[in-house]
């Protein structure tokens, strides 16, 4: 069996449409942090706070949904 790793897409908004996802309070904080600009608009734009680690929780949830489909193994497929 060949295993190909799943890499999250560059556009992380794809995971927002997955059924059963709940918004974490940490994600709301990260969104509000990303929209505020403490420097008053001077200097370089900040990197969005969502890229710091919230994609991992979304990735783990998507991976859990994906592996749930294959828990029975080949016996469940009747092969």
From Swiss-Prot:
Domain of life, source organism: Eukaryota
Family: Belongs to the FAM236 family.
Protein known as: Protein FAM236A
Lineage of the organism: Eukaryota, Metazoa, Chordata, Craniata, Vertebrata
Gene: FAM236A
């Amino acid at each position: 069996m060949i295993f190909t790793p799943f890499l999250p897409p560059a556009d992380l908004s794809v995971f927002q449409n997955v059924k059963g996802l709940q918004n974490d309070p940490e994600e709301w904080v990260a969104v509000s942090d990303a929209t505020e600009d403490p420097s008053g608009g001077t200097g370089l734009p900040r990197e969005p706070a969502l890229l710091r680690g919230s994609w991992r929780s979304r990735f783990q949830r998507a991976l859990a949904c994906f592996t749930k489909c294959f828990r029975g193994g080949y016996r469940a497929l009747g092969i």
